Amino acid sequence: MAAGKEKKKVVRSTAWTVSEPLGTRYPSTIDTIPTNYHANFVQWMVSDAYAGTGNYGSQGQNQIFFDREHASEFFFEDNLPYVLTVPKYKFYNSGRPMTIIGYGFGGNKYSSQDRLNIDFSGNVNKKLQFGAGIDYIYSKGSYENQANKDFAWQVGSSYTGDRYEVQAFVSGYNLTNKENGGITDDRYITDPAKVQGGQTSVDPKTIP
């Protein structure tokens, strides 16, 4: 008598985002493959034509006009792509508890940068889901008085029934950025010997 084959049940996981103001659902992805993973930890992850102050986690602007997001009511956050907005928030339905952790680091002792992402999602049943996450960025910068520390958190939930759907989330952030005002003389970069009495090597942290 042949032994019966054991059936394995595959739990299908889905992800989606919603649009403003009607909350229309758009299918999204659950990124667990480290393809181009490094691109998440550079300032130019926003766009190939991105202009920033040179430090990860600081302000910047997409130079492709038609790819820019619409101006928000609080315009100070428009130049901070790390701030979570409604279209950026992902809802998950994983069936089982799921945690996605990402950590990236680079630089040396004086110019290190770190980013930690944690996303959690768990289901009460097939229709009701809860999620939470944090995003922490700490970067010292390449120049003096350029360090920043960004911390953001979010908590969300969704209900997908036969007749009704509800998606909601709450988020907050605390961003601390130093501003050095720029370099006083471009020759510290283009021709350092002229402004340093013949010395060609430059310590970025000492440039006035």
How would you name each of these model-derived features?
Residues D48-A49, G141-D150, G156-P208:
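Outer-membrane beta-barrel translocator/channel fold
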Residues M1-R25, N180, R187:
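Cleavable N-terminal export/targeting peptides
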Residues S94, N125, T160-Y164:
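Outer-membrane beta-barrel channels and translocator barrels
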Residues A71-P81, T85-F120, G141-S142:
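Short strand-turn segments of transmembrane beta-barrel domains in outer membranes
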Residues D114-Q154:
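Surface-exposed extracellular loop regions of Gram-negative outer-membrane beta-barrel proteins
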Residues I101-F105, I134-Y136, A168-G172:
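Transmembrane beta-barrel strands of outer-membrane/channel proteins
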